[in-house]
Every structure is written in structure tokens, then in C-alpha cells.
């Protein structure tokens, strides 16, 4: 008995005997897609064509170069359209795929060879699109967005290399005029061009000397929109709570450092803050706690919320200088000069820090609710990560200053609540989901309002009975959660 033929996902008639194809088609083992093209798959024809577009392109347009607007993705767009440079004049229309050719110089230096075809280099793609050509080319706004993305992700060296490569191929591509336009746009992206040479807000900001991370700004815009849609969450810091809050700054500083891994016992932290007893074996960690306390214990300082982007920059630098005074190697009060990251999260590039803070502040200034502003500024600072170290601490200081300035209750994140806080922050960073961080901070604010901070004894009684000091991993392993003091009081009265 003859062995059954094992057909590839896409079958070209030129590779097989006509009789074999005819028999398989009649028997229902193959379906005809178009002239000379078959498939054994029972999937929708459009799906078969889309997943085999590379083979189809290489066969129908051998040596073609993907060009024009198709260069950006290097593949067909959502409608299935793919633009190529090839000598063939007629388009190929298949279910789910339309390949549209135009004449051109063919492959150039820098183009990437794939399965019988080429993909234009980024430099060539930009030149082709800037040359124009109706619907087959990107708009000026789309081109500038592409360049902005390159600048954000790869920085100045990549832009300069891109311009050099474009200069080398411009004549061969017949794109000398397009190169002039590209060079002007890149100059704006490098803050060496003029504002009126570009149309996008991101590149205009770059040209004006305030380049920003446009992807982060989109994230901040989403955050502000979410927070603006929430009902106001007022929790006033009433005057009759003043005595209960005498020691609040101590615990605020303690827990803010604990989140960052600076671990002391409460007695050790009290000696550092109230007795200036700096442990010889951990002077830098001790100064972190002391510096944070100096900021949050100053009622005048904590009553200041930024009213402008200039205020934001000034407050950030001054507060950071105080918090990180004990770590001169971390450049207290000065923005970072090297890129930083945490795990898979890469923060805003140094050259984009100030511009991103300014643009982000402008996005958030429309928020009216103090709690919403507090959440927003905390996320803004944490996401930009403007300093070499101390970013989380200064972000939470900025958060609580927004609340203090509006006479609202401030927030502490107890040790046991660290996991929830960090998970919620990651959800905002990676998924643009802001409900968790708003909920976590709202609960932490309610918690802080219910703890009796009048004396260390009263405060630490509440901290102990609410699980505040439990190690986060121990809490997770044993299903231990942060409890509200009021909920325990109600149980005790029952």
C-alpha cells in the first residue's frame, strides 16, 4: 500500500507533479487557494495565507524588499497589505494578504535578507516614508513617532548611527531630499534642532531641550484618566487626632525604609532618630532612616505640594538631598547620569528624566482630589526613577506631602503590606492597571488613621495586633494579612 503524502502547510504547484495535485484535490486532501497554490489545512484560508506570508512573498516576488509603511513592522499590516520593491508590476491578491509592488533600487546596504526576500533597514524605511507616496507611506506624525521611539529606547548613539547610515544610502536609494528632512527630524530628537521643524509634541519638547519618554507619558495619561474617574476619597487629618499623631513621622520613616530593605528593629530605629545613635557597622542605612525622618517630621516641608513643574523638580531634588545625605556616592539631590532598572523594568533614560517629570506633572495637574494627586505623584516619581538611589522613599514623601498639604491623612505601608504594595505597583507599570495601587494606598491610609501613634507603647500595641511587623514572606506562607485596628476593636466589643 503506497504511503500517504505528507503535505506542507502551503503547497506550490511548481514543486509537485500535476497528477499528484489533481488526485489530492479531488480526494479532498488539498484545497486550492489561488492559481498554483494549495493547502491541506482545514483552517480558514485567510489564516493559512497569513501564517505563510513569508513563503508566498519569497515565491511570488523573489528578491523583493519590504518597503514604505510595511518597513516599520516588517510584515503585513492588520488588513493584510504588504508593500514591496520589486520589478513585477501586478499586485498579488490572496485571501488575507495583498502584496503591492513598486519599482525601486532593490536591496541596499543594511537591508536584511530573509526567506527569499529582504526587509529594509530602519534608515531606508525612514527615507522611503519621508519621500512620500500616498497611502503606502507613513504620515509625518507616524514617522516622528517612530523616531521618538528609537530615541527613547536606544538613545543618542542609535540616532547618530541611523543618520550616518541614511546618509550612506541616500544617493543609491534616490532619497537625497528625504535625507535632508530626516536629518532635520533627528536633530530635533537630539535637542539640536528647531521646534518648528517637527510636528509631534514629543519631538517639539526634544527640540526645546526637554525630551521626554513618550511611552511613559502615555502610561501617566492612562493613570490620570483612571484616577479622575474615581469618586473623591477624602480622609481628613482632623485636629483632634493631633496628639495621636505625635509619633507618626517616626513610623512613616521606619516603614518607608523597611520597604526598601533597610531593616532595623523599632528600638534601633528609635535610637538612631531620637538619640542620634548611628551604629558604626551600618552608618549609611542609619542615615537613610534619619534623613527620611528629617523630611517627614518637618511640618512646613510636608505642607508643600508642587504647584508647577519647576516646583516638582525643586522639591524632589531638595528632599532627595536630605534623605540621601549619608550616601554621597549616590549623588544626593542630583538626577541620575546612568540608566537604572529593577528586574525586568527599565526606568526612564537619564536624558529624558527632567522632561518626563515635567510632562508627567502637566498630565496630572488636572486632578483635583488630594488622594488622586498623591497616588499620581507617587507613581510618577517611582516610574521615572530620577535618582541613582532613594527613589521609592522620595516618591512616598511626595505622596504624603500632597495629602498633608490638603490636611488629609497620610499613608504608611507596614512591613507585612510590602508585597501588596509592590505587586500593585507592578500591575500599574507593566499592565497599565491602576485599580490595585489605588486600593492598596487607600487601605494603607485608612490603616494609618486608625493606629494610635500617641506613644510608642500605644502605637506598637496596634502594630503588633494588626500584624504590621510580620515579615512579608512569613505572612504569605501563613496566610497572615494586615488588619484594621477598628475591625479588631469591634470584635473585642462584641
Which role does the model predict for each range below?
Residues 1-33, 41-53, 58-59, 63-389, ...:
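FIC/Doc superfamily catalytic core
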Residues 38:
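Short helix-loop capping/hinge segments that flank enzyme active sites or metal/cofactor-binding pockets
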Amino acid at each position: 500500500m503506497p504511503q500517504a503524502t505528507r503535505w506542507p502547510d502551503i503547497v506550490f504547484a511548481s514543486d509537485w507533479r500535476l497528477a499528484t495535485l489533481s488526485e489530492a484535490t479531488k480526494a479532498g486532501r488539498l484545497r486550492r487557494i489561488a492559481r498554483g497554490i494549495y493547502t491541506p489545512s482545514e483552517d480558514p484560508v485567510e489564516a493559512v495565507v497569513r501564517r505563510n506570508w513569508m513563503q508566498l512573498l519569497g515565491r511570488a516576488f523573489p528578491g523583493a524588499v519590504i518597503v514604505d509603511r510595511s518597513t516599520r513592522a516588517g510584515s503585513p499590516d492588520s488588513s493584510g497589505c504588504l508593500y514591496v520593491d520589486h520589478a513585477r508590476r501586478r499586485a498579488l491578491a490572496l485571501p488575507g494578504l495583498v502584496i503591492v509592488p513598486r519599482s525601486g533600487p532593490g536591496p541596499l546596504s543594511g537591508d536584511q535578507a530573509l526567506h527569499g526576500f529582504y526587509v529594509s533597514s530602519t534608515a531606508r524605511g525612514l527615507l522611503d516614508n519621508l519621500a512620500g507616496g500616498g497611502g503606502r507611506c507613513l504620515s509625518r506624525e507616524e514617522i516622528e513617532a517612530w523616531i521618538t521611539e528609537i530615541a527613547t529606547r536606544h538613545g543618542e548613539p542609535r540616532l547618530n548611527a541611523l543618520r550616518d547610515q541614511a546618509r550612506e544610502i541616500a544617493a543609491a536609494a534616490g532619497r537625497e531630499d528625504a535625507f535632508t528632512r530626516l536629518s532635520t527630524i533627528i536633530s530635533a530628537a537630539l535637542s539640536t534642532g528647531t521646534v518648528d521643524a517637527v510636528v509631534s509634541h514629543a519631538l517639539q519638547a526634544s527640540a526645546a531641550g526637554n525630551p521626554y519618554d513618550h511611552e511613559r507619558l502615555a502610561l501617566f495619561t492612562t493613570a490620570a484618566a483612571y484616577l479622575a474617574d474615581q469618586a473623591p476619597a477624602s480622609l481628613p487629618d482632623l485636629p483632634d487626632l493631633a496628639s495621636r499623631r505625635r509619633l507618626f513621622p517616626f513610623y512613616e520613616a521606619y516603614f518607608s525604609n523597611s520597604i526598601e530593605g533597610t531593616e532595623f528593629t523599632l528600638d534601633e530605629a528609635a535610637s538612631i532618630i531620637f538619640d542620634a545613635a548611628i551604629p558604626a557597622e551600618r552608618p549609611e542605612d542609619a542615615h537613610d532612616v534619619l534623613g527620611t525622618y528629617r523630611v517627614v517630621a518637618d511640618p512646613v516641608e510636608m505642607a508643600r505640594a508642587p504647584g508647577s513643574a519647576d516646583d516638582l523638580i525643586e522639591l524632589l531634588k531638595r528632599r532627595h538631598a536630605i534623605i540621601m545625605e549619608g550616601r554621597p556616592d549616590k549623588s544626593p539631590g542630583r538626577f541620575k547620569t546612568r540608566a537604572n532598572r529593577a528586574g525586568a523594568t527599565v526606568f526612564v533614560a537619564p536624558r529624558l528624566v527632567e522632561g518626563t517629570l515635567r510632562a508627567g506633572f502637566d498630565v496630572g495637574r488636572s486632578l483635583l482630589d488630594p488622594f488622586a494627586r498623591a497616588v499620581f505623584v507617587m507613581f510618577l516619581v517611582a516610574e521615572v526613577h530620577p535618582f541613582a538611589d532613594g527613589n521609592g522613599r522620595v516618591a512616598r514623601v511626595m505622596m504624603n506631602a500632597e495629602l498633608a498639604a490638603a490636611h488629609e491623612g497620610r499613608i504608611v505601608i507596614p512591613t507585612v503590606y510590602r508585597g501588596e504594595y509592590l505587586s500593585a505597583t507592578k500591575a500599574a507599570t507593566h499592565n497599565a492597571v491602576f485599580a490595585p495601587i489605588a486600593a492598596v494606598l487607600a487601605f494603607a491610609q485608612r490603616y494609618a488613621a486608625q493606629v494610635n501613634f500617641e506613644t510608642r507603647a500605644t502605637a506598637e500595641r496596634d502594630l503588633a495586633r494588626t500584624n504590621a511587623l510580620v515579615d512579608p514572606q512569613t505572612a504569605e506562607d501563613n496566610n497572615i494579612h494586615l488588619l484594621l485596628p477598628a475591625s479588631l476593636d469591634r470584635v473585642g466589643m462584641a
